[in-house]
Amino acid sequence: MNKHLLFLLFLLSCSMGATAQSDFARGADISWCTEMEADGRMFYNASGDPVDIFALMKESGMTAIRLRVWVNPARYGYGAWCDSADVVHKAIRAHEQGFDLMLDFHYSDFFADQGRQNTPLDWQGYTPEQLDQAITAHTRNILLALKDEGITPRWVQVGNETNSGMVFPTGAIDWNKSGAARFEAYVARSNAGYRAVKDVFPQAQVIIHLGGAEMAQWFFPDFQAAGGEFDIIGISHYPTAEEWNSTALGATHSNVNAAQWVAEAAATFGVPVMICETGFQVAQPGLAKTVITDLFNRMTAIPQCAGIFYWEPQTDGLWRPAYYAHLGWNAYDKGAFSDTGQPTAALAPFATPDVPTANYQLSTVNHQLSIIRCGQLYILRNGEIYTAQGARVE
């Protein structure tokens, strides 16, 4: 039979009635909300009525809340925001609205991310063993405080954007070594957090979070070989107006690439993948709606993608934490609220319970055609169709 006809039949063989996953998390990280409230900020619905931010997230279609956890931000100079008491307070409010909860442990006094993994001031000078004990105790203390309130987190991130490790320098990935050996110190720190989570909440899903989906294929083989434990791969994905508009010139926009990488990671490592952070320029809410809708369409077409979380959507591009002035930082510009304190169109995709999903998607990356069909990744190469694992489809 003609190979082109075979390819067409292959695409059409999937039911055209594909729908969004019923368990797909639609979430928001609103960790700044208490600091904003203390600063006098209020939040309003489309009618202009003042609404509690957690209730407003519910009205906006969110099903889950993500909260970051810092060790001792007051010692760092930031104040008490995102410390244990603040986190528990916000978790109670989320629980009262019926949200699923994700905790995001940074194991730092301030933001830990791709370029910064500072050890908490109270932990500096610790031996590796003492650091593992501190990670365990910190994790357990927060989780036990939630347990005392009758709150069970569904997901727990052990570290934030840990592409290069965590709690530097003791938990950094050692790039002077090769293979699993370079991950050993980081894995010891990470596993201390993982086991603390499972000790308090055995059913909670532990996430290892990277700064981008493209990193999973080089990161997780050595992480696993070094004994790293995890249940879900988490990624950050921030598309931009600049790269989106460049598609008119023939470029592949990042949602296409991210969908392929998510499907590949899920197939390779056999675990779900979560978009733990996304956002788009607050100044372009109409385009944000288009781009985030496209992201939903692509990710809900992958059964192994567990959800999407918008990072600090309640910001408007003007408000910034007081401490940012000390650092010389500008306001975060990827929120999804207007300067009137109301949600913009950027959050509309979260309000749609059944975002239509494509039953297959096509993209060209690395000079081969990739097909996400019925949520599974296939490769078209030299007229033949292969699974993500390399087996030829007859």
Indicate residue ranges for each PLM-predicted region.
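Boundary/entry segment of secreted carbohydrate-active catalytic domains
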Residues: Q21-L56
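Sec-dependent N-terminal signal peptides
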Residues: H4-C14
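Active-site beta-loop-alpha junctions enriched in small/polar residues
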Residues: S31-C33, W70-N72, H106-F110, V158-N163, ...
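Glycoside hydrolase catalytic-domain groove-lining segments
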Residues: S47, V51-F54, K58, Q205, ...
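Hydrophobic faces of well-ordered beta-strands that scaffold small-molecule active sites
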Residues: A25-I30, I65-L67, L101-F105, R154-V158, ...
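C-terminal outer-membrane/trafficking sorting elements
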Residues: V355-E394
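Substrate-binding cleft and catalytic face of glycoside hydrolase catalytic domains
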Residues: L56-Q205, G211
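Aromatic-rich peripheral "rim/lid" segments of glycoside hydrolase catalytic domains that contact
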Residues: W175, P285-R298, I302-A358
